[in-house]
A protein has these predicted regions:
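Catalytic nucleophile loop
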Residues: 1-2
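Hydrolase active-site cap/lid region
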Residues: 6-71
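A short helix-to-beta-strand connector/capping loop
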Residues: 15, 93, 136-138
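Active-site nucleophile elbow and catalytic-triad environment of alpha/beta-hydrolase enzymes
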Residues: 69-88
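Short, proline-enriched alpha-helix->beta-strand connector loops that line the catalytic pocket
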Residues: 90-97
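C-terminal catalytic histidine-bearing segment of alpha/beta-hydrolase fold enzymes
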Residues: 97-111, 118-177
Length: 177
């Protein structure tokens, strides 16, 4: 959802007043490569089905992998770490943007065997940093801690919508001109 919201703000002629995203994957080149790596490192060659789906879907959407179709990955990504021109994020230089993330690396290591290369926090912070350097002072990264619980059973999971303070987010949205 968050990746789509950011891409919408980048590409549509009717611009939203503000955009927010909750721990979105932003760099689909990184997403593809981390899924490939996770499969390679999987225990007993039992690959996570989500990683297999991600690779298949991205190859269908782009016509191949990042090595052969990098320009297509740049087009579908809200942010691309390796795109030194950063065509896509320049379109966000005047739009207030909030990106929420809870990079609980110890949880990821223990529960999923994942490291920073497999989570979205790195590219979320990189995108906000680059937008700030482009002059967008209204681009903000909100990093939470111990807020991530999935409903209805309150299971701990850092990639959860519960990291957002809903009342505070609504106040922020309503304040946008």
């Amino acid at each position: 959802g968050g990746s789509c919201a950011i891409k919408y703000a980048e590409n549509e002629s009717v611009k939203p007043k503000a955009v927010f995203a909750i721990d979105p994957p932003l760099d689909f080149e990184r997403f593809y490569n981390s899924a490939k790596r996770d499969i390679r490192l999987s225990k007993d060659r039992q690959a996570n089905e989500e990683n297999i789906y991600i690779i298949d879907r991205l190859e269908k959407e782009t016509g191949g992998n990042p090595s052969t179709h990098l320009a297509e990955y740049y087009k579908i990504s809200p942010y691309s770490f390796s795109d030194t021109v950063q065509t896509e994020i320049k379109k966000l230089s005047t739009i207030p943007l909030r990106v929420y993330t809870e990079p609980d690396i110890n949880w990821w290591l223990k529960e999923r065997g994942a490291d920073f290369t497999s989570i979205n926090a790195t590219e979320c912070s990189a995108m906000i940093n680059e937008l700030n350097k482009l002059g967008n002072e209204d681009a903000v990264l909100i990093v939470t801690q111990n807020n991530s619980y999935r409903k209805p059973d309150n299971r701990r999971h850092p990639h959860s919508w519960s990291i957002v303070d809903n009342a505070e987010l609504i106040k922020w949205l309503l304040k946008q001109p």
